[in-house]
């Protein structure tokens, strides 16, 4: 299984390149989109080469998701905690974006560790609500401001759900796919995923289950959020899964779970297409090799017609 990296590789490379060439006044203006419709924009001007603006656009949160000014609950506090005073949050952000950070290279030492953190801005922002819930779980409490059923946005117009309790947090994903082939492959993949969890080597991993219908924990969720053509996956997270360094890994793996499944579905589909092409090519080669043999056999197995005496004389006269 391949896990997605928490930092944007292109963003990290852009930041490292800029940090290594601060003595050069170079103008940058890069925009790109990564999985689940998260858009980035990096700007550096010739006028202020030590200032870098990083803007991030997140998908619009659906009504049931916890959000504040277009950002997940706790995102601003998470940014301040992660990056400290070396970064400035612009209010309002650049037009068309959910968040804009200003980095002054003359005031911040741009080492690789710091830039890797900045390249992980997606994890910091979108994982903020999960961290709030899981930090309370680690202390075996429940945040008083949370509802019994918490919805968190993770894809455009889609949410997954958490049921926080003092001793555990139940996480449920409605799995939706637009393509019918993707739906079939995802359903098969998820069943195998759940089956693999039963292996002895994974005894300490969070328990998980798959069902074609919504689990009981999602009772009370809006009906439109429970349409899942690939079923529902449920994880149960205990305090031991969010202790110490495990917290960040658990938050990232859950917030990108649908993307993780989608990646493996597309990879499997591509692998099957490759196998099919190879089989077709091998069949074509076999047919091509059979053609000369058929010609040889037809030459060796010619049938001769017996001619009459008059026909022989007529043939010889020609």
From Swiss-Prot:
Xref: InterPro entries: ARPC2, ARPC2/4
Gene3D superfamilies: 3.30.1460.20
Record has Cytoplasm as a keyword: yes
Alphabetic keyword roster: Actin-binding, Cell projection, Cytoplasm, Cytoskeleton
GO cellular component entries: Arp2/3 protein complex; cell projection; cytoplasm
Region (Disordered): 297-318
Consequence of gene disruption: Distorted trichomes.
Location(s), subcellular: Cytoplasm, Cytoskeleton; Cell projection
Highest rank taxon of the organism: Eukaryota
Tissue localization of expression: Expressed at low levels in all tissues with a relatively highest expression in inflorescences.
GO molecular function, one term: actin binding
Signal peptide range: none
UniProt record, GO biological process: actin filament organization; actin filament polymerization; Arp2/3 complex-mediated actin nucleation; trichome morphogenesis
Main location: cytoplasm
Function: Functions as actin-binding component of the Arp2/3 complex which is involved in regulation of actin polymerization and together with an activating nucleation-promoting factor (NPF) mediates the formation of branched actin networks. Seems to contact the mother actin filament. Arp2/3 complex plays a critical role in the control of cell morphogenesis via the modulation of cell polarity development.
Family indicated by similarity: Belongs to the ARPC2 family.
Oligomeric and partner information: Component of the Arp2/3 complex composed of ARP2, ARP3, ARPC1/p41-ARC, ARPC2/p34-ARC, ARPC3/p21-ARC, ARPC4/p20-ARC and ARPC5/p16-ARC. Interacts with ARPC4.
Protein's UniProt name: Actin-related protein 2/3 complex subunit 2A
Organism (species): Arabidopsis thaliana
